């Protein structure tokens, strides 16, 4: 069984438990004052395994499934036996990295809560875009696929605009920083291991897309 599927199963089970138990929800949700005042750093991780509702859970997990399977397999091909471990490490660290700006901004805000795997899923999606920028991404209500290298910047710009606007209850900051972390992780892992020139491969695939 793949790491992606295992993470999805765990996330679904924990989220379902939280839907039916306010105690589980409150114990696992990302609440910055609980981190700064009570050293409950585990919340950086646990909040990624609970969701606000069924729609939130479904959208995150279906996105994670399709991109995660591809990225996990690519990591195994590139990094060999260490690939799956690196993939899991990227996902878990992305949960933390994507929330650090949120924490610094809201560490004394007793009214702030955040939950969901979006930051880590964003890291996986953008690692996938870096691996295969020409792969087309399909969205609801748009009758054509958008190449990853076009979708990525557009997604980040829209997320930044929505984050600045601040008119909804979505943590767009986590999406943005999760995306940056996924890109950075693959670049660094490829460089340190000497097994993958992520930037070079990305540029070559984009050039091939325009020349084909």
List PLM regions with ranges.
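A detector for small-residue-rich transmembrane helices and their helix-helix packing motifs
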Residues: 1-212
